[in-house]
Each structure stands twice: as C-alpha cells, then as structure tokens.
C-alpha cells in the first residue's frame, strides 16, 4: 500500500468519524449523562427524583432531573437501549438540534404531566416517558 493510499484511507476514516460525530453527538451526550448519574449515591438520586411535595415547595428542577436518574443498572440499561433504538431509527431524518428540542419538550411534558395529572405517583425516575415523547415526535415529523 502506498503512502498516498494510506493517507486517502485515513482521510476517509476521519471524514466518517466527523460525520458520525456530527449526527450522534447529542444522543451520545445524553447517554453518557445517564450513565454518569447512575454512579450517584442514593441520597443524591432522591434529591433529583420527581416527588410531589418537594416540587410543591419550589424544587421544580425535579421535573427535569428525575428523568436522567434511574433505579439501578438494569433500569439504566433498558432506557439506554430504548433511547438508542429510537435515535438510530430516525437518525437520517432528524438533526441533533431537532432531537434536542424533542427531548426538551418531552422531558418537560412528562415531568409536568406526572406532577399535574398523576398525583398518586409518589416517586418517579427514568427516561421512558421522554423516549415515548421523542418517538411520537419522530413519527409525526419524520
């Protein structure tokens, strides 16, 4: 193999990586955030979970943070796989910007929906609801 062929292959690999990164940076960032929050101690996860009483007393961040923490490894893995499947299914049709907007609206919608319409749910964590919101967005828009 000549030097020119090696350089050509390296350029193609760099282009492929740049294209991958351009399309996947947001999804990968979300998945890394979820993995990192799994390492948090239980008392911190409790501070981030959606619990009605603290939200009623002003801890509104819980409406969003609750969806990025999980009950353990299995719960995290299931949500990561679900998010990956949905993201991969529509990768060619949706930009990272559109994914960011869809996830933002889904997270806020799920948090407010549980808080306002499901007061019987005492404690909520996980990204499942937002994944369904993103899937719905992709099916409507894509």
PLM region descriptions:
Residues 26-41, 82-137:
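Small-polar-interrupted transmembrane alpha-helices in polytopic inner-membrane proteins
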Residues 140-142:
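Metallo-beta-lactamase
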Residues 55-66, 110-116:
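Short, hydrophobic/aliphatic alpha-helical segments
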Residues 1-61:
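N-terminal signal-anchor transmembrane helix
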Residues 19-22, 67-73, 117, 121:
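Membrane-interfacial loop-to-transmembrane-helix junctions in polytopic alpha-helical membrane proteins
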Residues 47-49, 67-74, 93-101:
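Short, amphipathic, aromatic/basic-enriched membrane-interface segments that mark the entry/exit
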Residues 59-80:
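Interfacial helix-start motif at the membrane-water boundary
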